[in-house]
């Protein structure tokens, strides 16, 4: 007599709790990417020209601000370079780890706590014009976030049967985006431009320290929620049969024959997809890195506008994902992706024609933000 089939059902509560790992990741990266490029611009401008970026802008020497952007780009690219090296290392180490708290949790906890401690030192060293201290703090955060990242990503598949992982991935992404949204809210209520655009005498360290401290506290809280509610070893033992059933069902639905070599057509398609992904992410990361400086130094607008752009972009992405699925069903994925990339290209081209409004609205002489850029951001 055969045993009755195991019914697979997603544990939504557990998946939401696992999502707190992504909450911490996106929270930290949003603060890091929104504040650090401007910190680097100001501190290198001061080191190279003896004046803050605000003084250079007021004095009509904005071209000197532009001249330090290559340094900013190199330093900000280090997280991607570190990811190429460190993510596979920590991923492999966590795969082989066995501990009373699981194989992923030791890396998640260590990465979280060390990053949370080092993170607030970035604005502190910046405020006191200490380039070495600031760069070292950034490096520590990068290294230990890489320790955190891969195990955090792997945790959900470890405790979720394969056929349910797509739905689970959607849930944890929502929790993660809440972390990114928390960072944008900090940027709206504590605009970086209020610090950057004022004189040295009026620059108060708390103006830039608070977002980093809050981010560190929320990261630790999210890690603690994860630790006290998700017991890796216990869950894996409890759902062992479900995981095995999930593997069996996945093998039936999408059989893969590893013994057959990849065809030339499939190989060419793979390389084309990888090339497209590479170019897309290179473009998107470049814009993401410099958008804060673009708003503060070129448009001369308040930095909170950058955060509003982030929110608008996030909402537009969610709507776009929903629409794209339906379009792909009708015209195919290839044409859907091509149309999407074409629309993004048009958005970037239009963005190059945006110029400062010239209308002073801020206490430090900031201009009003071009409304058209909000529209372009939705398009791109």
What are these language model-derived features?
Residues 1-13, 125-136, 143, 147-148, ...:
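Intracellular loop-helix junctions on the cytosolic face of multi-pass helical membrane proteins
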Residues 96-112, 330-342:
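Cytoplasmic membrane-interface "Motif A"-like loop-to-helix N-cap segments
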Residues 34-70, 289-306:
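Short amphipathic helix-loop junctions that connect adjacent transmembrane helices
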Residues 107-129, 342-367:
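C-terminal ends and interior cores of transmembrane alpha-helices
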Residues 118-148, 278, 362-380:
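Hydrophobic core of transmembrane alpha-helices in multi-pass small-molecule transporters
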Residues 75-83, 308-317:
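Transmembrane alpha-helical segments of major facilitator superfamily
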Residues 84-101, 320-333:
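Helix-to-loop junctions at the C-terminal end of transmembrane segments
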Residues 8-49, 266-287, 378:
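Pair of pore-lining "gating" transmembrane helices in MFS-fold secondary transporters
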